[in-house]
């Protein structure tokens, strides 16, 4: 009988959990409980997603450090889930030392295999704030659907992933000034090189895992439309440092590091409960992975995260 590894999407730590968070958590909790009742050895992990511009901007609004904000909201999340009697085996955090260790190790593996490239690109820079405007630090009109308040990384209206430079009429989220393009260096994961492995994995996993139809269609669209190298670094202060010469002062993009939180939280559980996390994450013949996510998170869980694991 295979063991069952269950995850629910890591909620952003910048606010109180909403119904969308609870639906995923409750669904995963019901499934994990059913698995245990049927005799499956089950590990259910979740935790707060703590890095990225969502946290930085919220901390700036409240006049506290990102670390202080994360500590406060992590406990709010944990208390709400305790009230709902969610039976996590571990509810962790992506700002933990073990998360940094595993993310950097995976990056080094990808880099050693030639799957990381360096590119100098133009990004939006705010002269007033004296910083590059990554992700939520810039808002503007979506070039795909025309939504007037799209974020720099993703349009909340149509769900399309974006680059900040694609926005029409961009504005700095902090001071509302109009940013200007400026050159900066970033690191990219070579998704086209991983595509054959990803396609093979997706064809098998989507059938065996009973993927929802929208997950299959969205993933196939990403692959069909052509995978491109994707930036995995950001010009931010709050995040996991990039362990590569020439990239001091940069951190990993939150959607590169966040899904790895499932692994690091399992590792934290293993340290507390006396098991090796690799027995859950590196034993596909004996472990089945079940992930409960929202539709906005599909490509990160079916393309970006598995590509990181397959490539490393």
Language-model features: locations:
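N-terminal, positively charged nucleic-acid-binding surface of large information/translation enzymes
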Residues: 1-201
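Structured secondary-structure scaffolds
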Residues: 1-46, 98-102, 154, 170-312
């Amino acid at each position: 009988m295979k063991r069952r590894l269950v995850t629910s999407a890591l909620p952003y730590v910048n606010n109180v959990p909403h119904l969308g968070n609870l639906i995923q958590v409750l669904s995963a909790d019901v499934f994990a409980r059913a698995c245990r009742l049927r005799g499956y050895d089950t590990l259910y992990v979740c935790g707060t997603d703590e890095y990225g511009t969502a946290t930085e901007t919220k901390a700036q609004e409240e006049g506290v450090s990102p670390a202080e904000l994360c500590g406060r909201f992590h406990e709010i999340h944990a208390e709400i889930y305790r009230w709902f009697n969610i039976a996590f085996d571990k509810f962790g955090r992506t700002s933990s030392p073990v998360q940094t260790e595993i993310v950097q190790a995976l990056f080094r593996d990808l880099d050693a295999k030639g799957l990381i490239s360096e590119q100098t690109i133009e990004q939006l820079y705010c002269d007033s704030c004296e910083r590059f405007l990554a992700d939520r630090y810039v808002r503007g009109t979506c070039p795909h659907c025309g939504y007037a308040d799209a974020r720099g990384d993703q349009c909340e209206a149509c769900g399309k992933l974006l680059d900040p430079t694609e926005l029409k009429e961009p504005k700095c989220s902090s001071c509302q000034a109009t940013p200007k393009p400026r050159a900066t260096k970033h690191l990219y994961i070579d998704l086209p090189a991983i595509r054959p492995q990803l396609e093979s994995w997706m064809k098998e996993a989507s059938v065996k895992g009973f993927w929802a139809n929208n997950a299959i269609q969205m993933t196939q669209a990403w692959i069909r439309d052509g995978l491109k190298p994707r930036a995995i670094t950001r010009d931010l202060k709050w995040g996991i440092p990039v362990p590569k010469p020439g990239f001091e002062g940069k951190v990993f993009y939150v959607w590169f590091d966040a899904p790895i939180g499932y692994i690091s939280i399992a590792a934290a559980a293993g340290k507390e409960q006396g098991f090796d996390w690799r027995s859950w994450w590196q034993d596909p013949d004996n472990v089945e992975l079940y992930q409960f996510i929202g539709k906005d998170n599909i490509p990160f869980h079916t393309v970006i995260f598995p590509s990181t694991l397959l490539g490393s």
